[in-house]
A protein has these predicted regions:
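Proline/Glycine/Serine-rich low-complexity intrinsically disordered segments
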Residues: 1-134
């Protein structure tokens, strides 16, 4: 379904904001920016917005799985335009700190191999946050 003529709420300065302004605004989508996500949810619930565009995990856990979000749902496919949204979430390290990078990579590999990662993730998420295909 087209978003043309719709009002979409977005947190200003985010990658979603950049994407929406580049891809949707030229197609007659009204982009409404906010300082924080609570303001977006308030306007969505009160009918001042048709949709919101944000991080899927945040939307699911901070809104859709709450009482005020129970009448809303995800729509459309995930947006994965690496030109704007990048390639996922990462950890920032000091450039050239190869030892720390190696220790972190080894620790992540170890907990994924021994099942610790899966146990922790299952406690908090209903999907694999590491990005493994289901």
């Amino acid at each position: 379904a087209s978003l043309a003529g719709k009002r979409v709420g977005i947190i200003q300065g985010t990658t979603q904001d950049m994407y929406a302004k580049a891809e949707w605004a030229p197609k007659s989508v009204t982009i409404v920016t906010y300082q924080n996500q609570d303001q977006v949810y308030q306007d969505l619930v009160n009918g001042r917005l048709d949709a919101t565009f944000q991080d899927k995990t945040q939307a699911g856990y901070s809104f859709l799985k709450t009482e005020r979000g129970k009448h809303f749902a995800f729509a459309g496919d995930d947006i994965t335009d690496s030109r704007i949204t990048g390639f996922g979430v990462a950890m920032g390290l000091r450039k050239g700190d190869a030892a720390l990078k190696s220790r972190l990579n080894d620790a992540i590999a170890a907990i994924r191999a021994n099942g610790t990662y899966q146990k922790i993730a299952a406690k908090y998420f209903d999907f694999d946050i590491y990005g493994a295909k289901q």
